[in-house]
Design a protein with these regions (language model features):
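Conserved glycine-rich FAD pyrophosphate-binding loop
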Residues: 1-126
Length: 126
């Protein structure tokens, strides 16, 4: 699991572009009991969209290739519900929606922040 940290560091080492990655730190920490790894990537210069563009798609693909999940005990949050499709198929996401519908039938608890929106199509509820 910690191989992700090593592989992200290697990915940064291959980067050629306008953003200086020489001082970027990549650390992993998590929960051994349930196999969660939190990836912390930081730059002394603060947040850079370029750094996110270098790393984020790589991490999603790396995780999908190993049949992992990009979410764990904290969920995917408000900014990335659509990214759940990297590690869960549509049937699994629909099962999650149905469970949520049981406990939140009016959709008032964190609307659009937990699961990606339903794809429009025959028989879909939007």
């Amino acid at each position: 699991m910690y191989d992700l940290v090593v592989d992200v560091r290697a990915r940064l080492g291959q980067y050629v572009g306008p953003f200086d990655v020489s001082n970027v730190r990549v650390l992993g920490y998590g929960h051994l009991g349930d196999g969660n790894l939190h990836l912390n990537v930081s730059s002394p210069d603060g947040y850079h969209a370029e750094l996110e563009k270098i790393i984020e798609p790589f991490v999603y693909q790396w995780t999908a290739d190993r049949r992992g999940s990009i979410s764990a005990e904290h969920g995917v949050g408000a900014m990335k519900p659509g990214e759940l499709r990297h590690s869960k198929d549509e049937a699994s996401i629909e099962a999650m929606r149905r469970i949520k519908d049981v406990f939140d039938p009016r959709g008032i608890l964190n609307p659009y922040k937990v699961l990606p929106p339903r794809k429009a199509g025959p028989g879909s509820k939007l």
